[in-house]
Every structure is written in C-alpha cells, then in structure tokens.
C-alpha cells in the first residue's frame, strides 16, 4: 500500500521498520520538528526523523497541523491508501483523518478503552494491571475513541518497568499494524464501560509518598522508570530511585519514610521497601551498597 507514517519517539520506530519490511511504500513521514536537547541545547531530530532519513523517505516536520489548510492540502495530495500514526504528538483534524482512502490507523499502547490518553504504559504499571497490550484503532476526532481493528495483550510482570514494557509493546505495535493493513478487519466500536484515562505525566508524579504501601510505591518506581522517575529527599538532597524491592511481610512500628536498620530499607504505610538502586544529583545511578559506602544512613533517618 501507499502509506503516510506519522510518529516521533522511539516507540514509533519499530512500526516504521515493520511497514517497510512488509513491502509497503511509505511516501512521507511526519514527525515533530527538531527540539533543543542536551547541555548545549543543540537541535536534535526525533528518532523517527532519523529512521526515515536513513531509509531515504521524505520527512515533513510541521509545528502544527490542526488549522493549517496548506498542510491539509499537502497531506491529501500524497494520495495515500492509509496513514499509520504512532505517538505523533499533534492532533489531526478531520480534513487529515479523512484524506487517505482507508483513513488513519493509530497504534495505541493499551487495551482500549482502558488507558486512553498520553501515558498508557506508565499508568498500567502504576495501577497494578496484570496485562497491557496494543490496540490498532481507526482514528476519529475524539481522544483515542475510535473503533478497534485488532488488539494483542501481553502480561505485565512483577519486574516490568515502563522501559521494558515500552519496548515490548512497540514491537507488538509494528507487527499488529502490518497485520491490520493486510487483513483489514471490521472495526469494532469501543465499549462504553471500562473507560479510563492516562494523564500527561509531569515530574511531580514521581514524588514518593511513604504513607502508601510498599507494593504501590514499587509500582510507582517501575512505572515511572526511566521518566519522569520516582524520587524522595534525604537531608534536602533529591534521590532518584531506580529500583526497589517491596517487603510486604516486614513488621515494624516506625513512621513511614523511616529507615529500618543500617540499610536503605524504608518503612511504608504498609510493609517496607528496600531501595536497590538510586541516583544523586549530577551522578550516575548506583547500587544501594555503593551509596551507603560513601554516605552511611543511620537507623531512624527520615526520607520525605
């Protein structure tokens, strides 16, 4: 088929590769414009931009498309059979949704209608879901409300992070959208029951509340790794927590946030959490044992 691909982050790249490997003609790639990044704030192209250029595909980087009629006309002029959208980052107006012969298909990283919105991967882990998955959706003007063509589930393990689940779902998404284009299954409207929304994440979502249970905090850490990252403070120093182990059977009477013994086992509202890896400002992630060698933490120390 003659396709347009629209995507921006690493999540989108396997889908672009899968479409090319399946023999589809990708006539143009739309992605977010280069953004300042790194300490020098040099302009950096998106992962999809890099992948498209490596494949010799025309790249378009409009800053906005919703009300730009010239962009609508340029999009329609590509005469595509379909557009495949994977974490593009811009809202598409009806003029663009309706332009391709088969419309626009979205690769969404959840089992719709659960976790519509911006952070479905992180939200599934933080909420303690037993599974996640990918939905191939016929896009409409709503927020992830379109009819679903195909879905594929994958279990969420007790050690999955947003990073590991992201990588698994991105590969599933590429495979599934190729199948959707080949089979063209009948779209099934999403049920009205079971709708949840995944809000856009900010750094504040990472702040640990030690009055919560050890299991909940563990899910927060895993669900927000690598970004925005879960964090706490020790003596006014922000510590990013990279990995931890919940100890639900730990019996203690200490206040939440208090260290138990000469270690980084922290009292929680229910149970306790052993911090395994953490990061100080300006430093690399390190093991708890390496941290304690340089900065002993006495029993009864409070983290907030």
Curated annotation (Swiss-Prot):
E.C. code: 2.1.2.9
Source organism superkingdom: Bacteria
A GO cellular component annotation in the UniProt record: cytosol
Keyword entries, A-Z: Protein biosynthesis, Transferase
Gene Ontology MF terms in the entry: methionyl-tRNA formyltransferase activity
Annotated function: Attaches a formyl group to the free amino group of methionyl-tRNA(fMet). The formyl group appears to play a dual role in the initiator identity of N-formylmethionyl-tRNA by promoting its recognition by IF2 and preventing the misappropriation of this tRNA by the elongation apparatus.
NCBIfam families: fmt (TIGR00460)
Protein name, entry field: Methionyl-tRNA formyltransferase
